[in-house]
Amino acid sequence: MTENRIRDWYNHYDGEVYCSFSGGKDSTVLLDIIQNTMGVYDVPAVFVDTGLEYPEIKAFVKNVGDVTIVRPKMNFRQVIEKYGYPVISKEVSRRVQYAKKAIAEGREENHGDYKKLCGLAVDKNGQKSPYNCEKWKFLLNAPFNCSSECCTIMKKNPMKKYEKESGKKPIVATMASESRLRKEKWLISGCNTFDSERPISRPMSFWTEQDVLEYIYTHKISYANEIYGDICTDKSGKYYTTKAQRTGCVFCMFGCHLEKEPNRFQRLAESHPKLYQYCINGGTDESGVWLPDGKGLGLGKVLDYIGVDYK
């Protein structure tokens, strides 16, 4: 089915498509399906160099070969300074960001995001909205700003610029199992969204983490094993990596509150101590708002506030 979705996308746009390639295992599988399983070699791989990748990921990308590299206009520190820190999830950070803006402008009473954070939003039947997230209301009083803008500024915008300049449409390796928002998008639009404002193909939407690991294991394809380690199976036949499970942005805090210890930051302290020191240390209070400084990004204070151990 994945191959069919890719071929439909490729044919619809007369081959003017590209593969969004992060160097992670999911997009590595997607690129292998396009090139080696389907035998389509005129689909370029495009990598966004955000500066937030593990060194091992960047090294792997360089070894892949013909990869187009694009870069954002702002670095992570600049995004934090202007918009805020990425915490809990994209959805929660966005709600906190816009609710705080509504509060500052004195219009929070009927503001949707504020009401959801207070647990007051209702659906069309007058029932409590499933999107209420009062658990995170305390972030409205955090000594730092929250935002999900980093994903847009550092990943999506460089890709959109590439799309505008090249005329090519994206194929991405996101999966519905990764988040509620991605699942909802897939259920509404399917794998290929031809008619949206930004047409996009997500041919692996119905895959799971196990599917990805099984593909790599079975097809014996090259992947960033320096960071993931080996792919093995346990007694029940479940696949797992011996090192990192996910390799997104190194300093991202989305989802870290859900992880068992050692969590991503505790593992980072062992595997990449210099990166750990830079992201955890530093930070300064500027007019009541916590911001990065010359010593580091100051994530330690943020993680303390949301109750995530990083030591």
Report each predicted region and the residues it spans:
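ATP-dependent adenylation/nucleotidyltransferase module used to activate substrates
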Residues: 1-211, 218
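ATP/NTP-dependent adenylation/nucleotidyl-transfer catalytic domains that generate, transfer
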Residues: 197, 208-311
